[in-house]
């Protein structure tokens, strides 16, 4: 009896990933000073693929390099191409060093970039910023 329950529980966990077929989507590039996160979604905002610099094996200060952002964008872009992505609208957020290289990596995969937006949040004099670093 216990074996039947465990077999059904295992089949629920090992569900096959459903491949979506979407022609155009949005690439969200979040480039902070410490890491770069690339998420590719459809027009409704449902995630198709994502990758981070840290997830590609870069640790510490190497996560925040343009090359790490390029590798992460290539991984996310290849997974999106498998879902049928042809056109991408790119939304860049943050001041990090991986902004430009992530967009170039997506472009080099053969995906047509239709629009590039900078959606970095800018405060209208909101919270007090942290004090300056003195080195």
UniProtKB/Swiss-Prot annotation:
- Family the UniProt entry places it in: Belongs to the universal ribosomal protein uS11 family.
Sorted alphabetically, which InterPro entries does this protein's record hold?
Answer: Ribosomal_uS11, Ribosomal_uS11_bac-type, Ribosomal_uS11_CS, Ribosomal_uS11_sf
Q: Which Gene3D superfamilies match?
A: Ribosomal protein S11
Keywords carried by this UniProt record: Ribonucleoprotein, Ribosomal protein, RNA-binding, rRNA-binding
HAMAP family to which the protein is assigned, alphabetical: Ribosomal_uS11
| Subunit composition and interactions | Part of the 30S ribosomal subunit. Interacts with proteins S7 and S18. Binds to IF-3.
This protein's GO CC annotations: ribonucleoprotein complex; ribosome
UniProt function note: Located on the platform of the 30S subunit, it bridges several disparate RNA helices of the 16S rRNA. Forms part of the Shine-Dalgarno cleft in the 70S ribosome.
Q: Which NCBIfam families match?
A: PRK05309.1, uS11_bact
One biological process term in Gene Ontology: translation
Where does the source fall among the domains of life?
Answer: Bacteria
- What GO molecular function terms would the record report? rRNA binding; structural constituent of ribosome
Name of the protein described by the UniProt record: Small ribosomal subunit protein uS11
Q: Which Pfam families match?
A: Ribosomal_S11
């Amino acid at each position: 009896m216990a074996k039947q329950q465990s077999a059904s529980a295992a089949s629920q966990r090992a569900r096959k990933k459903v491949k979506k077929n979407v022609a155009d989507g949005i690439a969200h590039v979040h480039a902070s000073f410490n890491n770069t996160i690339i998420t590719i979604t459809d027009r409704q905002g449902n995630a198709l693929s994502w990758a981070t610099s840290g997830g590609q094996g870069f640790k510490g200060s190497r996560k925040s390099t343009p090359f790490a952002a390029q590798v992460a964008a290539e991984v996310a872009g290849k997974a999106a191409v498998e879902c049928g992505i042809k056109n991408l609208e790119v939304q860049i957020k943050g001041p990090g060093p991986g902004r430009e290289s992530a967009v170039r990596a997506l472009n080099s995969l053969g995906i047509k970039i239709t629009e590039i937006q900078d959606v970095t949040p800018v405060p209208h004099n909101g919270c007090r910023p942290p004090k300056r670093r003195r080195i």
